[in-house]
């Protein structure tokens, strides 16, 4: 809000959020309509955002004036690196939250130590509410107050790519975003958003209440989503260009799934821990305010992967799979274990041929491979040792034959049966060994 004798102006009337395209101004809504989303097999589950701390960092005495708006927007939307020491400048916002403070926040985004003639300032009361929330950006790298980007970033994915039903449930497939037919690059888009009056947006978000806040959020929701989109491409997502004939499609991989979570990613020069922490803290504070009162949202198309229903045959197959997974194989002979492995492998192939959801197939495949690895790890004697034990039993039975002709005949028959079983087991065990050798090196991609 602007400090004016006749009353303050809000961002609803005073500012507009535009992007340059083909030499003209476009709105965030026009850009967001160019985005299409493709669901992947993975699933995104929203977790509750931790309540922000009440602690405000101590306001640092910075000589001169601080261009705070540029510091915030460059860290969120720009392409430059962010040094961890820069977090200290955000602590300066605490001075704006103090009662009877002489500090003022100018419309130009600068924190002035004193009110200056000729410079328009935001309303100090509204600024104090803003500063009480966003001065906590100075806590971004403090371990006690650090926010978890991996969990919080899921909210970005749901707000950008989720349908109404998915946002309500807090669950959606991880999606890729694609956009084309745009004159500029992602760098030019981020530059446009950097020059928005983002502080005015945040001040209104923190100071407006009731119907005025709902009106603000409804009218500016696409501007907020545009900020989240640019933040995704600048901080937490992989962006690739795919050439389709003469057209180049820009694809943002895995909206809502933070690509910086991997250990390999943290070892590269593109990983910026300080900026990562700052973005996480900003999202924690902003989503807490944004979600406090639900704004009216326009209905979005359902972009989820179609889910096929599981047939009765599929249900029977899954019941059988669960039986394999819960069955205890301890005490079984190596021959019997090889048979079980072969049965499970054939059963997995059967499930993969069914018209059921891919995530179920992947689950069956993963659990089957793990169960096979458990079988291989069992400390059982080799099949040769088992055959030797059978032969020893046969010899022992021969020496114990009675002189009674009838008993001798019975023992001879039993011996013949045992010998026949041993021979059959040997043949079957060779097959069992071939199954074992085939499945020992099985990985999740090999069973498909």
Curated annotation (Swiss-Prot):
InterPro entries: VP5
One Gene Ontology CC term in the entry: viral outer capsid
Residues covered by region (Disordered): 418-448
Domain of life per record: Viruses
Entry-linked Pfam families: VP5 (PF20807)
Source organism (scientific name): Lymantria dispar cypovirus 1 (isolate Rao)
Transmembrane segments: none
Annotated localization: Virion
Record's protein name: Putative structural protein VP5
Disulfide links within the chain: none
Composition bias, Polar residues: 431-442
Keywords from the named record: Capsid protein, Outer capsid protein, Virion
Main location: virion
């Amino acid at each position: 809000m602007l400090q004016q004798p006749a009353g303050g102006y809000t961002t609803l009337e005073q500012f507009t959020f535009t992007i340059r395209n083909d030499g003209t101004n476009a709105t965030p809504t026009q850009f967001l309509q160019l985005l299409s989303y493709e669901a992947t097999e993975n699933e995104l589950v929203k977790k509750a955002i931790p309540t922000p701390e009440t602690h405000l960092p101590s306001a640092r005495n910075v000589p001169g004036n601080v261009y705070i708006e540029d510091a915030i927007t460059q860290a969120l939307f720009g392409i430059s690196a962010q040094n961890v020491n820069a977090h200290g400048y955000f602590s300066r916002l605490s001075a704006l939250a103090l009662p009877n403070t002489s500090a003022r926040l100018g419309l130009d985004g600068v924190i002035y130590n004193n009110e200056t003639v000729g410079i328009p300032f935001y309303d100090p009361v509204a600024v104090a509410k803003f500063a009480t929330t966003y001065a906590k950006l100075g806590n971004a790298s403090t371990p006690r107050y650090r926010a978890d980007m991996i969990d919080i970033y899921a909210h970005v994915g749901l707000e950008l790519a989720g349908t109404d039903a998915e946002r309500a449930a807090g669950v959606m497939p991880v999606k890729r975003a694609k956009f084309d037919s745009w004159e500029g690059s992602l760098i030019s888009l981020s530059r446009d958003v950097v020059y928005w009056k983002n502080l005015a947006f945040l001040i209104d978000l923190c100071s407006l209440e009731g119907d005025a806040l709902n009106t603000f959020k409804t009218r500016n929701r696409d501007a907020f989503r545009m900020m989240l989109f640019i933040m995704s491409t600048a901080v937490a997502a992989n962006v690739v260009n795919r050439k389709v004939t003469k057209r180049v499609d820009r694809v943002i991989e895995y909206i809502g799934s933070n690509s910086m979570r991997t250990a390999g990613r943290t070892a590269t020069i593109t990983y910026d821990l300080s900026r990562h922490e700052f973005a996480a803290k900003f999202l924690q504070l902003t989503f807490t305010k944004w979600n406090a009162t639900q704004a009216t949202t326009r209905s979005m198309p359902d972009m989820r992967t179609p889910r096929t229903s599981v047939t009765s045959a599929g249900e029977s197959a899954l019941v059988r799979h669960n039986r394999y997974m819960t069955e205890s194989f301890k005490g079984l002979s190596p021959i019997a274990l090889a048979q079980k492995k072969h049965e499970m492998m054939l059963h997995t192939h059967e499930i993969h041929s069914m018209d059921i959801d891919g995530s179920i197939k992947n689950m069956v495949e993963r659990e089957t491979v793990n169960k096979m690895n458990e079988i291989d790890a069992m400390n059982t004697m080799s099949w040769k040792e088992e055959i030797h034990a059978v032969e020893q039993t046969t010899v022992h039975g021969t020496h114990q034959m009675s002189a009674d002709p009838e008993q001798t005949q019975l023992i001879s028959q039993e011996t013949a049966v045992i010998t026949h079983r041993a021979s059959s087991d040997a043949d079957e065990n060779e097959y069992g060994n071939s199954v074992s050798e085939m499945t020992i090196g099985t990985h999740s991609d090999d069973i498909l």
